[in-house]
Amino acid sequence: MSKSTAEIRQAFLDFFHSKGHQVVSSSSLVPNNDPTLLFTNAGMNQFKDVFLGLDKRAYSRATTSQRCVRAGGKHNDLENVGYTARHHTFFEMLGNFSFGDYFKHDAISFAWELLTGEQWFNLPKEKLWVTVYETDDEAYEIWANDIGIPRERIIRIGDNKGSAFASDNFWQMGDTGPCGPCTEIFFDHGDHIWGGPPGSAEEDGDRYIEIWNIVFMQFNRQSDGTMLPLPKPSVDTGMGLERIAAVLQHVNSNYEIDLFRDLIKAVAEVTGATDLSSKSLRVIADHIRSCAFLISDGVIPSNENRGYVLRRIIRRAIRHGNMLGAKETFFYKLVAPLIAVMGPAADELKQQQAMVEQVLKTEEEQFARTLERGLALLDEELSKLTGDTLDGETAFRLYDTYGFPVDLTADVCRERNLKVDEAGFEQAMEAQRRRARESSGFGADYNNLIRVDSASQFSGYNHVHQQATVTALFRNGEAVDEIHEGEEAVVVLNQTPFYGESGGQVGDTGELKNATATFAVADTQKYGQAIGHLGQLTHGTLRVNHSIDAQVDVARRNRIRLNHSATHLLHAALRKTLGDHVAQKGSLVNDKYLRFDFSHFEAMKPEQIRLVEDMVNEQIRRNMPVQTEVMELDAAKEKGAMALFGEKYDDQVRVLTMGDFSTELCGGIHASRTGDIGLFRILSESGTAAGIRRIEAVTGEGAIALLHQQSDLLQDVAHLVKGDTNNLADKVRAVLDRSKMLERELQQLKDQQAAQESASLSSNAKLVNGVKLLVSQLDNVEPKMLRTMVDDLKNQLGSAIIVLATTADDKVSLIVGVTKDLTSKVKAGELIADIAQQVGGKGGGRPDMAQAGGTNVQALPSALASVEAWVASRL
């Protein structure tokens, strides 16, 4: 009996755990602190800083099953998903990693044992082929001599991509940095499937499928192309879970493995489809995986960056559901079946299920309003095509008006053997794309970050003042030996009480000082293992190795820590009030206020906001001790500690506990007791995106200041309405009622005035070619009264052309009315356009009524004088 996908995942992790590897949980699909990546797309992403030497772990061997998304940017597989056997937007990457521990021999031996061992995957040895980099004799000989693979099944692959070291079998992180050769393992599905071994002319066939890539990081590539050996070579491997599942379950397509079979059945059930071989079922089954996990990890559909990629995937799935005959919203209904088939790998998704379903349902309902009309327009345009390519302007119009991502339009065209002019589409999109680029941090050069070789010992949990030594200085991003008065710089110390910004808490400010220099710290940031103090030298000269007195701004620090502790109470109160789907999606904690973003699918009701506020204040009054404990990450999770969105944790973590009310992982600085917070007041609750709400609040001194401000405002209002704060509501209601009554009376007077004006005006009408024409400039008449006057004059004159104008605040207001019997000859919209352009304005309307505005008051008399000739020319 073949292994299930869940069993394969667990077997991989168990195998490497037995080989001394730390099992590390999958990181978020939103890369942490890496601006070069749109989404996590490989197992090594979460270890990138380790490979770069910017981070250290307590272990030197690790294994993971990493959730990955490839859709958008360099790794854009979207158009192929559902149409090929192995393309996905979402997949799991099984990996094992060595950080300066074992190297080629053990990495290859481990892979072979797992793949062929009877108690593990037990694959036939004769079915396995391998490739190595052309000059990697060491790996070649390990495969041939130690493992015993026949040399005819070991293929050397050289530089096949146009330049030195540009090869399928040579991996590099970038133009510079860690790199090295790799060896790949292929499975031969048999001669009943077309294709040749890697390196052959038929290598793109489906017979020989790559199942494992093992990268040997042994060089550090310099900017001049020189390859310097790394002092501690490392290993990074990746094996697609879905690919190895297809091999072990004896199927040729990833969509035939147990996980996808069950998902495809669920898709068929919610859409009413009967043909289980439909490619649309495969598209939807794939897309629910990426969409659900992306939303769970904090990505929300939008028109920019990650949110736009998510929106494209969702809308592609919805369109394929439409093709299958789905008549109502269906996509969100697949979250529950997805959780069922993913098993333990979906534990975090299960906690967010209600929120994920709501976001998907809302997005589907919004798109459904335009999908049918957009498809009708596309059908119409395609029916008029004389060639085989839809122009880019039409593709852009579908995107701009109906929300059709270009790949959805390309999907429709593909089914009709047509293409889309994507270059033309990109040209039409340039303004939006430029705006997105300017507002995003993607594409930043990772190497531009300050590289600090030293580490800083943080002492700020217990101290706000400390003697320290300057270990590094940076000016304009470059390391220097000294800085001088007036210069801005980053100062790194061997130990510091200053907190570096992280976890939503802003960095400390304060002062670094000795007998000869004073450095004003405006911010504190983390640089790998070092803590950098950003600011300006206000006096003297500061050099590396100088002793320094580090003093945190204590008053500011105290306000920050109270706000930070309040966010934990707020988080717990929200979960107790709204449900367990609530999860932190971001925060800002500074000395003035706190901002807390969380997952929830609708605006909070006023009574819910009050309940949350009361609950937090109750915990403050309980004056519970705020306790911290350092423990293993797994132990903390077993204790029920919640991890915060987007935060990266070490193996040893700080667990913050506030009585029995809140337990979370947090490395920030906090109050000693909840009572220190004093008071908590919510300023606002709002939405930032679909499925994401935001609360802003103040504590302590800030909350008291808010109460004083509100009290002063009440006193001012009470004075204005000649009452007191005890009966203020009644007084305000009385004032509003009287105001409404006076407004009604005023409107009645204005109507009477307009009627009187109209009655007197009607006698001024003159005959032009037998038609009554009335042209008049009115004084002291509000622009909004002109329409009422035109209607009155039409009734009085019977058949007529009426032009009225008034001025106010150096602006012209115009209106033209034409009775319906005359609109075949004189159209109000045409007449007013002629008048408006003379007074520096524009306008329009129906043939019988049109309005306009202008800015040239001085030109109004001559413009009105021209009306008679214009009308005469039309009659």
Swiss-Prot record:
Tell me where in or outside the cell this protein is found: Cytoplasm
- Reaction catalysed by this chain? tRNA(Ala) + L-alanine + ATP = L-alanyl-tRNA(Ala) + AMP + diphosphate
Name the positions where Zn(2+) binds.
564, 568, 666, 670
GO biological process annotation, one example: negative regulation of DNA-templated transcription
What EC number(s) would the UniProt record show? 6.1.1.7
Q: Which SMART domains match?
A: tRNA_SAD (SM00863)
Alphabetical GO CC annotations of the entry are: cytosol
Broad class of the protein's primary localization: cytoplasm
Cofactor binding mode and count: Binds 1 zinc ion per subunit.
Which GO molecular function entries does the Swiss-Prot or TrEMBL record give?
alanine-tRNA ligase activity; aminoacyl-tRNA deacylase activity; ATP binding; tRNA binding; zinc ion binding
Alphabetically sorted, this entry's keywords are:
Aminoacyl-tRNA synthetase, ATP-binding, Cytoplasm, Ligase, Metal-binding, Nucleotide-binding, Protein biosynthesis, RNA-binding, tRNA-binding, Zinc
SUPFAM superfamilies listed in its UniProt record: Class II aaRS and biotin synthetases, Putative anticodon-binding domain of alanyl-tRNA synthetase (AlaRS), ThrRS/AlaRS common domain, Translation proteins
CDD domains in the record: AlaRS_core
* Highest taxon listed in the record's lineage: Bacteria
Does DNA-binding count among this protein's keywords? no
Q: Which HAMAP family match?
A: Ala_tRNA_synth_B
Describe, as the record does, how this protein assembles with itself and its partners: Homotetramer.
Q: Which family does it belong to?
A: Belongs to the class-II aminoacyl-tRNA synthetase family.
What job does the chain carry out? Catalyzes the attachment of alanine to tRNA(Ala) in a two-step reaction: alanine is first activated by ATP to form Ala-AMP and then transferred to the acceptor end of tRNA(Ala). Also edits incorrectly charged Ser-tRNA(Ala) and Gly-tRNA(Ala) via its editing domain.
Name of the protein this chain belongs to: Alanine--tRNA ligase
Source organism (scientific name): Yersinia enterocolitica serotype O:8 / biotype 1B (strain NCTC 13174 / 8081)
Q: What is the lineage of its organism?
A: Bacteria, Pseudomonadati, Pseudomonadota, Gammaproteobacteria, Enterobacterales
